[in-house]
From Swiss-Prot:
CDD domains to which the protein is assigned, alphabetical: AAA, HLD_clamp_RFC
Annotated GO biological process: DNA replication
Keyword RNA-binding applies: no
Organism from which the protein derives: Saccharolobus islandicus (strain M.14.25 / Kamchatka #1)
Name the UniProt record assigns to this protein: Replication factor C large subunit
């Protein structure tokens, strides 16, 4: 099952509505590149979610016969990630017989500058060295972390999709998918979407596929549900209890946690939710396939992310055969945190205790030198000096354990 917002996205610039100014700026920019005199090496394409930033970049590549290399900056964020994927592409030629390449870095405002050290610097270096045009997208271009990028790029803003173009698009989809949508429901979707075409299309698909008809009552119920993100426990319950694919998919896409962590949560709790061993097998089979699609998506083919979400949500939900029976009722189970998180937490606690001890030792030496040269010997005879170091109970317990291992 492909998401409708991907299925019906414009393939050419002429099909992109309500963005005439942005289209003109992008065309002038790309033509300056093709003529060998770029007026800017990179463009920062910005606008609210769902207005078509990625779609516009893809349509530009299509119309000018450019090979598009797409990379999600908020998932491949460290300096080495940026360099290894994007920089190589900027140096080597295309193998597809196109006129050249267009590099797309999606969601640069999703970069966490504290955790992803060097990512912004990596992008700045890429802008300086690239031999091909570079487009970046951002919902919030005024993020302080993007200041240097703003100074090095041509900024192009996108408008929200107007009500009339959005209405035409939704009616076209209803006709193509043979979905009946009441006028009141259509108006409600358009009003609540606030120009976010992806949100509107996803809502239309979620209800249309589940019920075959889109009514105001159903739309209002879904809109209330999507006003807040679901915590992991709510997400699991909605996925495992879902009887329809769209219900499970909505739960997954409304989760507070990202797709990597969601897979860990689902994996940990499949054996808890499903009693039948065959149901467990089918659920893990769907989850393993989701992991494969997710890995391929991270390799640059982000359209595959939709399939990963389908499998980790709808695929897992459909694993329980008993759901097909009319009298089926969901079983309440007590879900648990992934053991992976618990191990990480325990490991961090151990490292923190060790580091506090090393800080006490490293009075006349650096931390790293003490860790590598002094600490291994200290474990052997630490009991002679524990009082002088003012070790607390937790640190003593750690040293007792470490000296035995």
């Amino acid at each position: 099952m492909i998401q409708w917002f991907l299925k019906y996205r414009p393939r050419s610039l002429k099909d992109v509505e309500n963005q005439d100014g942005a289209k003109k700026e992008l065309q002038e920019w790309i033509e300056s590149w093709l003529n060998g005199k770029p007026n800017a090496k990179a463009v920062l394409l910005h606008g609210p979610p769902g207005v078509g930033k990625t779609t516009l970049a893809e349509a530009l590549a299509h119309d000018y016969n450019l090979e598009l290399l797409e990379m999600n900056a908020s998932d491949s964020r460290k300096l080495q990630d940026i360099k290894s994927v994007a920089e190589k592409a900027s140096v080597y030629g295309s193998i597809f017989g196109t006129r050249g390449k267009l590099i797309l870095l999606d969601e640069v405002d999703g970069i966490n500058v504290r955790e992803d050290t060097g990512a912004i610097q990596g992008i700045l270096e890429l802008i300086e060295k690239t031999k091909y045009p570079l487009i970046m997208t951002a919902n919030d271009p005024w993020n302080p972390a993007l200041r240097e990028l703003r100074n090095k790029t041509k900024m192009v803003g996108l408008n929200k999709l107007g009500k009339y173009p959005l209405r035409r698009l939704l009616k076209k989809i209803c006709q193509a998918e043979k979905i009946i949508c009441d006028d009141e429901a259509l108006n409600y979707i358009i009003d609540t979407s606030e120009g976010d075409a992806r949100y509107a299309i996803n809502m239309l698909q979620g209800i249309g596929e589940g019920y075959g008809k889109v009514t105001l009552d159903l739309v209002e119920a879904m809109a209330r549900r999507k006003e807040r993100e679901l915590d992991p426990f709510e997400t699991l319950r909605d996925i495992f209890w879902a009887r329809y694919a769209w219900q499970a998919k909505n739960a997954a896409t409304s989760a507070q946690i990202d797709y990597d962590m969601l897979i860990r949560w689902i994996s940990e709790n499949i054996p808890i939710q499903y009693d039948n061993i065959e149901d467990v097998w089918r659920a893990f089979d769907a989850l393993s396939r989701a992991s494969i699609f997710l890995k391929r998506a991270k390799g640059g083919d982000w359209d595959l992310l939709s399939y990963a979400y389908d499998l980790m949500s709808s695929g897992v939900a459909a694993a329980e055969i008993e759901k097909k029976k009319p009298n089926w009722k969901p079983k309440w189970k007590k879900y648990q945190f992934p053991s992976y998180i618990q191990l990480l937490s325990k490991s961090k606690d151990i490292r923190d205790t060790r580091d506090e001890i090393i800080k006490k030792l490293a009075i006349h030496s650096s931390f790293n030198k003490t860790l590598n040269d002094t600490y291994p010997f200290f474990l052997i005879f630490y009991k002679k000096y524990d009082k002088r170091l003012s070790l607390n109970t937790k640190e003593k317990e750690y040293l007792n354990s470490a000296s035995k291992s």
